[in-house]
């Protein structure tokens, strides 16, 4: 039976390194999900209240244009990652792209997804230095603590 692998994915170089590592190391019969947590901007971008001030409306439009561009960049990065996996021998139908709006926080949302039947979680390491990482933490550290019963691979 093939493993279900969850790769926490954004458009960062670290996430791409995690994909490249999976492409090199894991058996090609795995089922891979590239999972992205995205800001829930629908409530802001779909807001068309007549009470909006002209200033807020102009700022809303600018914000929504930027958010749409970010989503396009993420989609392009997901397709690039899928291409890397396919080029390494995974079949197209073994790879799923999944994006969910942020509900409880990036790490909590990744952990919640991991608890839906995955055998392995793969994360890229952000690479904060020293004291900053100690105080701020990181998504990978939080996922480690929230999904302790799952195997987790953190790629630097």
Give the label of every model feature segment:
Residues 5, 22, 85, 110, ...:
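Hydrophobic structural packing positions in well-ordered secondary structure
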Residues 15-18, 106-107, 136:
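Amphipathic coiled-coil/heptad-repeat helices and related helical stalk/stem segments
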Residues 33-35, 96-100, 153:
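General small-molecule cofactor/ligand-binding pocket signal
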Residues 111-156:
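Gly/Ser-rich helix-loop-strand patches that form or flank binding pockets
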Residues 73, 79, 83-120:
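Structural beta-alpha unit
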Residues 2-64, 88:
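Small/aliphatic-rich secondary-structure junction motif
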Residues 30, 93, 150-151:
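A structural micro-motif
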């Amino acid at each position: 039976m093939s493993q279900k692998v969850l790769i926490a994915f954004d458009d960062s170089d670290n996430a791409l390194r995690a994909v490249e590592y999976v492409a090199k190391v894991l058996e090609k019969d795995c089922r891979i999900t590239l999972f992205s947590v995205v800001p829930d901007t629908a409530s802001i971008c779909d807001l068309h209240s007549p009470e909006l001030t002209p200033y807020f409306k102009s700022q809303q439009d600018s914000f929504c244009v930027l958010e749409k561009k970010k989503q396009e960049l993420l989609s392009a990065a997901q397709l690039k990652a899928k291409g890397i996996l396919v080029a390494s021998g995974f079949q197209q139908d073994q790879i799923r792209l999944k994006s969910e709006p942020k509900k409880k926080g990036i790490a909590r949302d990744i952990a919640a997804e991991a608890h839906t039947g995955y055998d392995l979680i793969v994360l890229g390491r952000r690479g904060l230095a020293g004291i900053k990482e100690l105080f701020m933490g990181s998504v990978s550290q939080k996922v480690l603590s929230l999904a302790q019963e799952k195997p987790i691979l953190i790629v630097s």
